[in-house]
Each structure stands twice: as C-alpha cells, then as structure tokens.
Amino acid sequence: MSRVSQARNLGKYFLLIDNMLVVLGFFVVFPLISIRFVDQMGWAAVMVGIALGLRQFIQQGLGIFGGAIADRFGAKPMIVTGMLMRAAGFATMGIAHEPWLLWFSCLLSGLGGTLFDPPRSALVVKLIRPQQRGRFFSLLMMQDSASAVIGALLGSWLLQYDFRLVCATGAVLFVLCAAFNAWLLPAWKLSTVRTPVREGMTRVMRDKRFVTYVLTLAGYYMLAVQVMLMLPIMVNDVAGAPSAVKWMYAIEACLSLTLLYPIARWSEKHFRLEHRLMAGLLIMSLSMMPVGMVSGLQQLFTLICLFYIGSIIAEPARETLSASLADARARGSYMGFSRLGLAIGGAIGYIGGGWLFDLGKSAHQPELPWMMLGIIGIFTFLALGWQFSQKRAARRLLERDA
C-alpha cells in the first residue's frame, strides 16, 4: 500500500472519531437551549432564536474567512483554537441568566465554529476520493444521528439536575476534541497550492454558479434548523415533558442507521445528485406544513419521521454536490463559503421562526410558522429546479458547439 493510500485510510478513521466527539459535544447542549430558556426560565422564543441565529450566522457566515485562513496556514491550528473557543462559549452559557450573556456565549461558540468547521470539511474533500464521498458523507450522517441521540440523552439526563452540568459536559468534550486534534492531526495542507487568503476568497466569489447555488440553499436551511428550535418546543408542548425531546432524536437515529446508507447507495445508482436534493427538500417542506395542526404526540412524531426521511435523502446529495463544485486550489475557501447558505438560512430560520412561533401563539394560530416554513421550502425547491435546468441547458449547448 502506498503512503498516500495509507494516509487516506488512517485519515478516514481520524475524521470519524473527530466527528463523533464534535457532534456529541454539540448535542449535549444545543437541543436543550430552547427547553432551558423558553420553558424553564420563561423567556420569549424570539430571544432564544436570536441567540441560536447569532451562533449560526457567525459560524457559517464567516466560514469563508476561516476557510481562507486555513488554506494559508493549514488546518491544525485553526481546528484546535476553534474547539477551545467553543468550549469557552459553553462554559459561559452555563451561567447565563440574562439574554445578553446567552448571546455572548453563542457568539463565542459561533466564532469557534468559524475556525474549526471549514478546515474539517476541507479535510474530508482532501482525504476522500470523489467516487467515495457520497458514501462517506452518508456514514458521517449515520454517525451524526447516533451521536446526536447519545448527546441529547445525556444532556436531558443532566438537565434534571442542573443546566450548568449540561454546559460543563459539552465544554469538556470540546476540550478533549481539541487535545485529540493537537496530538494526532498532521500539519496537512488543505489545498493543492498554498493559496493567499485574498486569492482564495476571490476565486470563490467569481464562481457565479457556486455562489448562486449556496445562496439558494438558505431556504433549505430555514427548515433544517428547526430541529434545534421549534420542533423541540413543539414536542415539549404536546408531550408536557422535556424528556420527550430525546425521543425525537431517537427517531432520527433509528431512521438514519437503518435507511440512510441503503438509500444513498441505491439512489446514487439511479438518480442525479440534484434530483435527490430536490426530492428530499420537497418531502421536508410538505411534512412541515401540518405540524401546527396536530394535537397528539403520535401524529407529531409521524410528521417528524417524514421530515427526517426527507433530510436523509437530501443531505448526502447536498454535501456531495457542494464538494464536487469546489476548486481544488482553494478547498478551504470553497467549503467555508458553502456554509453561507446555512448562515443566512439558519439566522432567518431561528429568529424568524421564533418570532412567528410567538406571533402564532399570541394570535391563537399555531399553524402560522409551520405553513410559512413549508411555503419557503416549496419556493426553494422551484428555485433549485430552475438553476439545475439552466445548468443542463448550458451543458447541452457546449456539447452541440463542440
């Protein structure tokens, strides 16, 4: 076995262990933020939505800068620094009794993610061969789901004692992850050349097709982020107990572990990436519309099942499509910019979703936020369809001219 092949194989195991620690640390804390501050402390959902949206926007919106810096200086220093910064954010969150302190803790957490997330994504693109990426992204999603459930279960159990224990556990996991990277991650370059920060960012911004695709995905993320805000609140309201939230993540884990890899293997043989992304988005949109009209936990979990199935279909295709569009000369910059759709969509989804949830509750129209999210998903579906049809038309024109 060549040294390159050996490095790729070892890199896969490193990425899986690293991903497990990151997801565990994140899901111990973040699914319980809305339960802690909305249900236990009585804050308005929009106040918590601002905090979650701020974290999302900072982490993903500034990702292009984190990715460009990683292109210049390498992945290791960015990842270690970012994980320690997130640990500090979680520690601060444990003592948050005023909105500004919660917002500050989410700001720290988001800045940490800005540093470690793009280089981690670029390492996947660097180490995994193009023909294997779809299956590897599916494995990562399966691991995400299992780790999310374990994290949510652990966080829910700790929450009955003290929210500070929840935050301390998340902080410790990120410190461990930082130590793991500092000890074992080689000083790998992310790109084929050591690209200056400004050049990497300029290369991305000139790629109009990639920029349009990323910005359109904001609508997709407005739906996806509700697993952190409105869906946990809805489950808690219907069930009458915060402990029911863990079953929402258990459903996701069961579906992912049983369906994600088989669906990915089968669909990659029969359907294009863009068709898989659009089909998953359509299922997510349609399953979200009736959520505000249900009154029983069984009905709610059925809709959540459909939502997760849509995500299972869409997410590996989205990740693979984003990676396939990245320029090898500026991988960090491309993977950082690819998070901008999540930054915009996540911020609007959290803040707008929280505001609509409060508005619907005060106006006795609980279906309002869910119908609006479903409509946004349908419009995003149509916009992606138009983009992909334009791309196919341009390809046919080039083939005819040739």
Curated annotation (Swiss-Prot):
Compartments, as annotated in UniProt = Cell inner membrane
Q: Does the record carry Cell cycle as a key word?
A: no
Predominant location category: membrane
**Coiled-coil regions listed:** none
Residue intervals annotated with topology Cytoplasmic: 1-12, 117-138, 186-213, 265-276, 321-339, 389-402
Q: Does the keyword Transmembrane helix apply?
A: yes
GO CC annotation, single = plasma membrane
A molecular function GO annotation: transmembrane transporter activity
Q: Per its UniProt record, what InterPro entries does this chain match?
A: MFS, MFS_dom, MFS_trans_sf, MFS_Transporters, Multidrug-R_MdtH
Give the highest taxon in the source lineage. Answer: Bacteria
Topology: which residues are Periplasmic?
A: 34-98, 160-164, 235-243, 298-299, 361-367
Pfam families, alphabetically?
MFS_1
Please report the record's description of how this protein sits within the membrane. Answer: Multi-pass membrane protein
Q: Where are the transmembrane segments?
A: 13-33, 99-116, 139-159, 165-185, 214-234, 244-264, 277-297, 300-320, 340-360, 368-388
Keywords attached to this Swiss-Prot or TrEMBL record, sorted alphabetically, are: Cell inner membrane, Cell membrane, Membrane, Transmembrane, Transmembrane helix, Transport
Q: Which family does it belong to?
A: Belongs to the major facilitator superfamily. DHA1 family. MdtH (TC 2.A.1.2.21) subfamily.
Name of this protein = Multidrug resistance protein MdtH
Q: What is the lineage of its organism?
A: Bacteria, Pseudomonadati, Pseudomonadota, Gammaproteobacteria, Enterobacterales
Instruction: Give the gene name.
Output: mdtH
